[in-house]
Amino acid sequence: MKLQADTLRERIEPLFLENFQRFGELGAALSIWQEGQRLFDLRGGFRDTKREQSWTEDTIVLVWSATKGIGSGCLLHTLQENKIKIDRRVSEFWPAFGQGGKMDVTIAQMVSHSAGLCALDENVEVTDYEAVIRAVEKQAPLWRPGSAHGYHARTFGFLIDELVRRVAGTSISKYWRTIFAEPLSLDFWIGLPEELNSRCATIYPARAETARAPVKFYRDLITPGTLQRRTFTSPYGLNAVSAMNKPENRAREFVSFGGIGSATALAKFYAMLANGGQIDGRKFFGDDALKLMTTTVSDGLDRVFEIPTAFSAGLMKDAAKAERNLFGPSANAFGHPGAGGSHAFADSENRIGFAYVMNQMEQSVLPNDKSLRLVDAMYL
């Protein structure tokens, strides 16, 4: 399908504005690309609840787990450049990882949330990278790797960051800046420089409301000792949304949940992936790496979310039994949402890159109507 920028904007803009009028959006931005070209951007609202700071072209915002998609892209590029297949064992490159019965865990299992490492037995702080890595190394899988999958909310970023460090000799944050962000002028950071805090929108927690679906997940999330509670609180710390508005925490390289940037940057990155791995006259990914992004590795009931989810090599896909598509109608679409409403993906079949970011979170584990109505309208 070929999108026409003018007619698409006429269809999308009223829905975008309706997010503020009907759905309680505070500030937000949207960016849609096709075939490596930007079709249009939209932005509106405010960076703060006092409504004193308008959301402008240079506003950036925390996107929580949408950062995982960026991190996964960096890992897959690292594997591509070093000719490493994802069926290789993690312990080949990270020997201490093999402790606790993990010697045969593959990269594919690790990046598809099926390694059974979503929670840690050792009580370590999320800000202490080395302590978290040591705890990961000692951790025994919580289920037989490859037999099931469950969302690795916090540990995922540490797992892929350490593997990139072992193979490429640098952190994902630095790899991202060098390989993608600087060459493509992408306004997205994993570890925000202090001088950019003045451009940041404040992120606000979801308003108190009756728990939305999946009800069982939300009930288990607040129950001590459950897998859900352990997953979202280990490694521990920075569980309050407000903590991530502090400059010292924005500066931390949290690959699982700390990325800060613009909708335009996210959409352009996914537009590159959707466009055969190339954009602006540069090619970043070959066919083999792109196939890893579109090919489902794990699909079915997620042990953490307790609903069907699916993952390729680090990217989320629509589950076969999902109640609603998150990434449009194409089976080849992939991406990663963020807590509360941010959403970004690539549709390689139609060469589309999409991103929606916001600062007023909603109580939802997956993208909500504010972004999904826009996705649906894009394919009318």
What spans do the regions from the language model cover?
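Active-site Gly/Thr loop motif
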Residues: 202-258, 263, 291, 295-349
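Active-site-proximal alpha-helical segments within enzyme catalytic domains
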Residues: 112-113, 156-163, 253, 257-279, ...
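Short, conserved catalytic-motif segment at the N-terminal edge
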Residues: 2-63, 83-88, 134
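Short, charged, amphipathic alpha-helices and their helix-cap/turn boundaries
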Residues: 42, 124-145, 170-187, 239-242
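Flexible glycine/proline-enriched surface loops and loop-helix/loop-strand junctions
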Residues: 56, 139-146, 156-158, 246-255
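Alpha-helical scaffold elements that line and support the substrate/ligand-binding pocket
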Residues: 36-37, 62-84, 110, 152-180, ...
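Active-site helix/loop module of the DD-peptidase/beta-lactamase fold
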Residues: 57, 62-66, 80-122, 138, ...
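Short, gly/Ser/Thr-rich active-site loops of penicillin-recognizing serine hydrolases
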Residues: 254, 275, 289, 294-301, ...
